[in-house]
Design a protein with these regions (language model features):
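Short glycine/proline- and aromatic-enriched beta-strand/turn motifs that initiate or cap beta-hairpins
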Residues: 1-27, 44, 188
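Transmembrane beta-barrel strands of outer-membrane/channel proteins
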Residues: 8-14, 57-65, 119-125, 167-173, ...
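Outer-membrane pore/translocation modules
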Residues: 56, 62-196, 200, 245-248
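Residues that define the transmembrane beta-barrel architecture of outer-membrane proteins
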Residues: 32-40, 92-102, 141-147, 199-205, ...
Length: 296
């Protein structure tokens, strides 16, 4: 965590994928999606120090622009036996909207000679547009609240701090997502009634890691990666039924990163690329992230 002051982080993520392993196969014919997400993060690190602990708070506001190409049927059926089949054409749709906002009311950090530690609590607020009647790609939000707990550390391998290993752990606890209305038994006197049937996605664990080396003043290069795994079962109905081969959601990626800073202007930035080499019931593709930070 940086020294006390106000900071603006501008995260720019570019994500492309054309397959979601697990949902009916390893590739969706004629489907591609590209999304650009700009996420300003406002962070305040207080000047207070209690028992060598630094305090801070932050908020993220993600805005999403996406293009997705898919095939749709058109024209009259070209055959009717044993079931109707149609010609298909490829169309591209674009969308823009606000996604779910993240509020971090508490960030704590400790700085030692060779180690830095940070922990935080945050709440994801379902501000993004979401409707259970929408096609999954028409939603910008998740439709539920999420509690997130983070713990991270950086270990400097030499006294000059030119080599570093960083780990950041996230644990997300998801709440209920309204799903649909169904007829269910209510009581012996009222055998059927209308009730909501909710879906609660299982808890998600995410590990982010990086190994970096300072190659010049203010310039670091390294390798980064992440692994995300659903650790508890999803409760309630899902759009696609049970997961493929009864596996829980996961995704993993790896790639290079370069960081730089210009302290005279209070500017720093990083550029990273991740190739997602494994996924289950989750999009699998390519992620490029450009981050620019300004301190005040």
């Amino acid at each position: 965590m940086p020294p006390s002051g106000f900071y603006i982080d501008d995260y720019n993520s570019f994500y492309f994928y054309n397959k979601v392993p697990g949902f009916g196969g390893q590739r969706q014919s004629g489907f591609e999606q590209f999304s650009y997400t700009q996420t300003p993060r406002l962070m305040w690190i207080t000047p207070w120090h209690i028992l060598a602990t630094d305090f801070g708070a932050a908020v993220r506001i993600p805005l999403v622009e996406r293009l997705y190409t898919h095939s749709i049927p058109y024209g009259p059926p070209i055959s009717t036996f044993p079931f109707p089949t149609y010609n298909h054409k490829t169309v591209t749709d674009s969308q823009f909207g606000l996604s779910d906002i993240q509020v971090e009311p508490l960030i704590l950090a400790w700085h030692l000679k060779r180690f830095d530690f940070v922990t935080s609590y945050s709440l994801w607020i379902p501000t993004g547009d979401w409707n259970h009647n929408n096609y999954i790609f028409d939603n910008f939000g998740q439709g539920y609240w999420t509690h997130s707990i983070e713990f991270g550390m950086t270990w400097y391998l030499d006294s000059e701090k030119t080599w570093a290993i960083s780990l950041l752990n996230h644990y997300d606890i998801n709440t209920k997502q309204y799903s649909t209305l169904v007829n269910v038994p209510v009581s012996p006197s009222h055998p059927l009634g209308i009730a909501s049937e909710d879906t609660t996605l299982g808890d998600i664990y995410t590990l982010e890691w990086a190994v970096s080396k300072t190659i010049a003043k203010g310039v670091d290069v390294g390798v980064t990666g992440y692994y995300q795994q659903q650790v508890t079962d999803t409760e309630g109905p899902t759009l696609n039924g049970p997961t493929w081969k009864n596996e829980k959601i996961h995704v993993a990626g790896i790639g290079p990163e370069i960081k730089g800073e210009y302290t005279k202007w209070g500017l720093s930035g990083s550029l990273r690329y991740a190739y997602e080499f494994s996924a289950m019931d989750h999009p699998q593709g390519h992620l490029i992230t450009l981050t620019v930070t300004k301190s005040f």
